[in-house]
């Protein structure tokens, strides 16, 4: 198997589309889609995805190195694994997305958008993941780690978002995120159209979206900054014990509200460079628009993903409260 990332960026296929290694079989399922199944019995089916936003290159490079080490025998595969490079079309152009945000297209969201390379890709990703989980052992627990980097700086540099779900959250997933030295966990309060909501809702996978620092071009990442999460995902796929957490106790937040842009004249009381987890206190105005201002009712809230430039009707930010 040739270089997974290089093939994807070049839009090429490997010389052979399937093969066997010392302890696993593999299949190239299409552009940026690689399935690996251990010869031995397994009890987990794991999706590792990156590049759903094409310019978030560090996680893409982490998955590429992990793949290389699996094929070189430096890392032993103990789970059934699907590696996903989400948006090759945008990756080649160094853009977050070209037409529309792929991470708002899942759970059938692509059906409400014009047909583009990216909407077609979202459909392919849904179908590929569905087949992967359906063809995995019925006894295998299902996991999905979707790796991202953020557009803006963050007062809590690394964090994970759990999709809203009615079934209980998986303790092993949470333990792995704590071991990865993440700074915070954020629990969504409503259904969404993200990749992880799709896998959680439809396949009861233990799913999380990981935000791991700043987006930089290929080759400019200091991957040593991602050593903790890299170690954890390698331990997950090889079923090794998780490392000990080296940071203070992880902070936990709940989404309490979404800031929806209802009018063209929409302003947020944050600078353009304001980091994620910026705070507001009771009585302060977070956003103004003719249809009504957003005034803080709680003692303190934190703002995540503020973006006043979204289209009307879309979310311009998340309002969080901290769970003590």
From Swiss-Prot:
Keywords assigned by UniProt, alphabetized? Arginine metabolism, Hydrolase, Metal-binding, Zinc
Q: What class of enzyme is it?
A: hydrolase
Does this UniProt record's set of keywords contain Iron-sulfur?
no
Q: Does the keyword Protease apply?
A: no
GO MF annotation: an example? zinc ion binding
Q: Which chemical reaction does it catalyze? A: N-succinyl-L-glutamate + H2O = L-glutamate + succinate
This entry's comment on the bound cofactor is: Binds 1 zinc ion per subunit.
> Which positions bind Zn(2+)?
53, 56, 148
Question: What domain of life does the UniProt record list for this protein's source?
Answer: Bacteria
Could you tell me the EC number(s) of this protein? Answer: 3.5.1.96
Cofactor(s) named in the record: Zn(2+)
Task: Name the residues annotated as catalytic in the UniProt entry.
Answer: 211
A GO biological process of this protein is: arginine catabolic process to succinate
Q: Where does the secretion signal sit in this chain?
A: none
Pathway assigned to this chain's UniProt record: Amino-acid degradation; L-arginine degradation via AST pathway; L-glutamate and succinate from L-arginine: step 5/5
Q: Provide the function of this protein.
A: Transforms N(2)-succinylglutamate into succinate and glutamate.
Family that this chain belongs to: Belongs to the AspA/AstE family. Succinylglutamate desuccinylase subfamily.
User: Per its record, how is this protein called by name?
Assistant: Succinylglutamate desuccinylase
The scientific name of the source species is: Acinetobacter baumannii (strain ATCC 17978 / DSM 105126 / CIP 53.77 / LMG 1025 / NCDC KC755 / 5377)
